[in-house]
Amino acid sequence: MTQVYNFSAGPAMLPVEVLRRAEQELRNWHGLGTSVMEISHRSKEFMQVAEESEKDLRDLLQIPANYKVLFCHGGARAQFAAVPLNLLGDSNSADYIDGGYWAHSAVKEAQKYCTPHVIDVTTHDNGLTGIQPMKQWKLSDNAAYVHYCPNETIDGVAINEQPDFGNKVVVADYSSSILSRPIDISRYGVIYAGAQKNIGPAGLTLVIVREDLLGKAHTALPSILDYKVLADNDSMFNTPPTFAWYLSGLVFKWLKEQGGLGEMEKRNQAKAELLYGAIDRTGFYRNQVAIANRSWMNVPFQMAEASLDKLFLSEAEAQGLQALKGHRVAGGMRASIYNAMPIEGVKALTDFMADFERRHG
């Protein structure tokens, strides 16, 4: 059987070791004779899953004690609404950094609840898209918070700086880069992330929120999106997505076994350098992102001859290189190389790219 590597942007591949363990435990979890999917979320057995997964996540990210960790429904799009409705308080304004598709999507949702001050930080030099340094961002004085997206999956654009905005409340959509490297949680008021890229399967959303920001929710905010309600109920205000929570907990344990986020940073950098090196080697492939802002997680690329795209994708699929088609907005190709993608998968892709170029260049 051909070795398959899944380059999907999300839902994305999970670590093989995690899938094997889940397979082994599926029908008889911890000797109960039932699946973890079938037990009550309030049972002592599942409460142990919840407690261990939060502890492991706190260890991985070094989350300070004055932050709550919430396991939620709704994906990042739900957080596009939850953030303003939880944080605006008496304000009607927030700074929104527009650096790409998902940042702009957050702006569109926020416009229902406030008047976002939109700050376009993209640059376009010599056909390459980049991001202004944070010190050049023109933040307003009275914004309730500053929202940005550190990694744009479609554009393949990353903001690698950590924010240093004094006492401003910083909110970040880390859906596609959480757990890929160490970050300083204390620089943020809220971090949120859909699970389906670097955490676990779709259906779970992670929120990390500083405690002093709780209790400011708009009266019209649905309780299921209220950070304080969720925190007060240990993320069990209603039935949570238990199987996704359990699998994410297995991923957290796998990350710790691999050496933590410092080790993942080294691996992710090596994978990205290998793939970008293959793209840059000749003019056959190209990436249109400034080097300083190239994403380690999502690598879009095009060919000089766009007519070859379909052939490239079909041949890649036949070689076990799946889900390389670019987003419908961007076209071309895109390789998403999250934590679970081994460097062997990237090597298989770059070998195929070189062979394809030899035959069609």
Curated annotation (Swiss-Prot):
Function: Catalyzes the reversible conversion of 3-phosphohydroxypyruvate to phosphoserine and of 3-hydroxy-2-oxo-4-phosphonooxybutanoate to phosphohydroxythreonine.
Subunit record text: Homodimer.
HAMAP family (UniProt xref): SerC_aminotrans_5
NCBIfam families membership: PRK05355.1, serC_1
Main location per the UniProt record: cytoplasm
Keyword terms, alphabetized: Amino-acid biosynthesis, Aminotransferase, Cytoplasm, Pyridoxal phosphate, Pyridoxine biosynthesis, Serine biosynthesis, Transferase
Annotated binding of pyridoxal 5'-phosphate, by residue: 76-77, 102, 153, 173, 196, 238-239
Record-given protein name: Phosphoserine aminotransferase
Organism: Yersinia pseudotuberculosis serotype O:1b (strain IP 31758)
Keyword Amino-acid biosynthesis among UniProt keywords: yes
GO molecular-function terms, A-Z: O-phospho-L-serine:2-oxoglutarate aminotransferase activity; pyridoxal phosphate binding
Cofactor(s) recorded in Swiss-Prot or TrEMBL: pyridoxal 5'-phosphate
Enzyme Commission designation: 2.6.1.52
Alphabetized CDD domains for the sequence: PSAT_like (cd00611)
Cited Pfam families: Aminotran_5
Family, similarity comment: Belongs to the class-V pyridoxal-phosphate-dependent aminotransferase family. SerC subfamily.
Pathway given in the UniProt record: Amino-acid biosynthesis; L-serine biosynthesis; L-serine from 3-phospho-D-glycerate: step 2/3; Cofactor biosynthesis; pyridoxine 5'-phosphate biosynthesis; pyridoxine 5'-phosphate from D-erythrose 4-phosphate: step 3/5
List of residues binding L-glutamate: 42
Compartment annotation: Cytoplasm
Modification type N6-(pyridoxal phosphate)lysine: residues: 197
GO cellular component: cytoplasm
GO biological process, one term: pyridoxine biosynthetic process
Catalytic reaction(s) noted: O-phospho-L-serine + 2-oxoglutarate = 3-phosphooxypyruvate + L-glutamate; 4-(phosphooxy)-L-threonine + 2-oxoglutarate = (R)-3-hydroxy-2-oxo-4-phosphooxybutanoate + L-glutamate
Cofactor binding notes: Binds 1 pyridoxal phosphate per subunit.
